[in-house]
Amino acid sequence: RQMCIRDRSMTVYPALVEEGNTVKEGRFSTPAEAEYQHRRALQRLLMQQLAESAKFLRSKLPGQTELGLLYRELGRVESLVEDILLASLDSCILEGEATLPRDGAGLASLAERKRGALTEHAEKLAKLTLDILKLWHGLQKRFKGKIDLAQAVALNDIKQQLSHLVYPGFVRETPAQWLKELPRYLKAIEMRLEKLPGQVQKDRVWSAELAGLWAQYQARAAKHAQEGKRDPQLELYRWWLEEYRVSLFGQQLGTKVPISDKRLSKQWSLVDA
């Protein structure tokens, strides 16, 4: 859709956009951003359309007491359960659709056709979330108490890594295909900590390399955010950085894709400027 702004013609992309628990109409400068916002808004509308199912799951979703205890430092269990439900609505109903519904009737018929598996999706995601939080909680304990100064560089790198893997809202923010890999990433951190006393120097070299790669990613991500861009190649690079960490610190766990510094560099060349 063309619009004139200050005598300049520009193309804008209409989409629904989430606003609290409701949605409104919005316009975006790129189709990727419009698609992303529209999809999140549809999750919210599905929560309203399938209100009975959502209410049932809020009260019956297994493991909520334990989830609440493990998530306590990050937020309220109610928020976590909402995120699990929204992400489950996405994976159960919206995932795999070539085009997303643009009207209420289209969304209603899609929901009716695919809602049968919602409980299964939500229970599976709750279990994955519990596994992730147990591993995360175990790692948090390692930072309490006296820290060996020789290991400080590695521990700072790990803390920073963890803050970008597990944070308030991570269940909904992390793409489903990568969320299921989080337990492996966290186990690789455990292995790194176990080996650390015997390879402090080696670890320091890797930490420096990873810090450079991450800074490069963050700078580009910030630039894209400012421009309203969403680049799938940059997102892929971000998760390949986690795979690269596994290849350095937890080789026995294996990687989802063959990975090396050369492959990372090649992927970076595909990222939008």
Model-identified regions with their sequence ranges:
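Short, small-residue-biased leader/transition segments that mark boundaries at the very start
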Residues: 1-5
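C-terminal amphipathic alpha-helical interaction region
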Residues: 139, 146-273
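Noncatalytic, helix-rich "gating/capping" subdomain that lines the substrate-entry/channel surface
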Residues: 6, 10-147
